[in-house]
């Protein structure tokens, strides 16, 4: 997969990107949710920069928290914050901007870029609101206020694994809907794929209804 040369707030998905499967083995105030935000599409330099910023604050201990703005993600973020504060670690909160209609080669590069740019702009606003809301509900958790925000364009599981490889966190914390039965076995969730494919410890948090 080719890599972009610079981190930009508007970048398109790398062509030929496919989701892996288990078989393949594939300083903010309480009112400021934008402690630090980087938006990249797999750029090593930008990911390394985000990792260094987080590690500088936590002496190398970082917890990566992928979120999709669901109640399950919020529960995972709160759990991760509690854990981070108990061990003097910091958080990198990751959101992967995914275009559901993305098909390699289907659109021209220009059309794809415009479409993903629009989705990325909307995602940034939702990301900001998600973090602002989480901060407002959990004012006692400094880890949430000081979290590094990282927004990456691509396919969720692929990008989560790539970011984990670059950032090298001590662990990942993710939310899950907790499906059971045949639907659970045949479909599988993104959280389950990350658990199976990521070499790092992954904790799954379920939202209490």
Describe the predicted segments one by one.
Residues 1-58, 132-172, 209:
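Structural beta-alpha unit
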Residues 3-11, 22-23, 32, 53-113:
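Small/aliphatic-rich secondary-structure junction motif
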Residues 85, 165-166, 196:
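Solvent-exposed polar/charged
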Residues 108-112, 166, 190-191:
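Short, hinge-like loop/turn segments at secondary-structure boundaries
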Residues 111-126:
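A short acidic, glycine-rich active-site loop
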Residues 171-196:
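Glycine-rich, Arg-bearing micro-motifs that act as flexible, cationic patches
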Residues 200-209:
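Short, flexible loop segments at boundaries between secondary-structure elements
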